[in-house]
Amino acid sequence: MKPGNLFFKVPIPAYVTRDEGSCFWRSESRGAFFMDFLVEKEKNMDRKLFTSECVTTGHPDKVADRISDSILDACLAQDPGSRVACETMVTTNFCLIAGEITTKARVDYAAVARRVIRDIGYTDPGLGFSDRDVEIQCRVHTQSPDIALGTNDQVGGAGDQGMMFGGACNETPELMPLPIAISRALTNRLTEKVGENPRLRPDGKAQVSVEYDEEGKPMGVDTVVVSIQHTEDYAMEDLRAFVKQEVIAPVLKDYGLDLSAVEHIYINPTGKFVVGGPDGDTGLTGRKIIVDTYGGYFSHGGGAFSGKDPTKVDRSGAYMARYMAKNIVAAQLADKCQVELAYAIGVAQPVSVRVDTYGTGKVSDEKLTQLLRDTFDMTPAGIIRTLDLRRPIYADTAARGHFGIQGKTWEKTDKAELLRSKAGL
């Protein structure tokens, strides 16, 4: 039933008029008011918007993530068996590194942090956070032997309890939801432009609202929001023109979209954004878990990724869940798929596996769940082996994103044909 026909099934009598500027109809004979369902735009009645955000590598929380993952990489480069749980806090010219690290590697944690800060672009002392002026303190000790008992190579159990989710859908070539895919592409391009435009600074954000039809298919981009730190002398008109033409337009074009079709574009909507980075907001490892995954499109188990070696199923389990979900969608067994894994500390096999295809599956969710159990090794040791996770590959995920990024082992679709064959399709 169309919105305009919700109440009025017959032509409106001549004595029924609408007050100018009102959304109500008046019956001149009765003085009654009726909601103006007739003139409400059908588009607005049916609109379904979903919004996701992403942040640049210079965002305070991402600075912390990247330091933690760079320390993890430095340990794995020398000792692939390193056990790392590294947390970082950054604020005005201060960086605290803490956590539990058991490794044979010899790593200068402070030197790693200083290099990361420099690489991100915080080199100007005037920013209130720079590689030269930052004070760095380390409070690191070894992993608890109680935890190590259940996660050693002989036992191969999970490093903690918890549930992890992975998802995929056919909205983009990388099989990611469109809102987070565009948001991440915008922030990655912003980061590139910071290196090219000396009046831009490292801290920034992007947010994208996508309109979906009644069947859940994306129709287009409704709203784009971009905020980027800048120098004091950068005229706002010039900044907005630069971001619109050099960042937003090319990214939309990559996804087959046109800038003119976006209903709302907001660039630095509050105006001035000079104070930023860790000088503007304190950053902590693991505080951008929705940015790191699917922008809220799929569920999240609550565990962060950065600073954790692959025996921590918060990270490796989520990577495996993405790998399995992506292969299901790549096999055209579903248009949209979420995989949930759950583990008990010290236990190798997951305590539960669940597939949800939101009614888009070509076979039942129960059959897909069994196919995953028959096809993939979901033990922590099996995940590490399958995805080759004992390598220094993690700082890049903190910088560019964990999912939908080419070259990651958990982004391969090498099991799609096998799954399709096993499903009998």
Tell what function each PLM region has.
Residues M45-A85:
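N-terminal, positively charged regions that mediate nucleic acid binding
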Residues T51, A111, R118-V275, G404-G407, ...:
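Glycine-rich, mobile lid/loop segments that gate access to catalytic sites or pores
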Residues E53-V55, H59-A64, G157-E171, V274-F298, ...:
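Conserved phosphate/anionic-ligand binding catalytic regions in large, soluble enzymes, centered on
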Residues S82-C86, G204-V210, E263-I267, L333-A344:
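A short glycine-rich, hydrophobically flanked beta-strand micro-motif that places a catalytic Asp/Glu
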Residues A85-T103, I345-Q349:
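Short, charge-patterned binding micro-sites
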Residues T91, K336, Y343-L425:
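Internal helix-turn-beta structural module
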Residues Y234-I328, Q332:
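Glycine-rich anion/phosphate-binding loop at the beta-strand->alpha-helix junction
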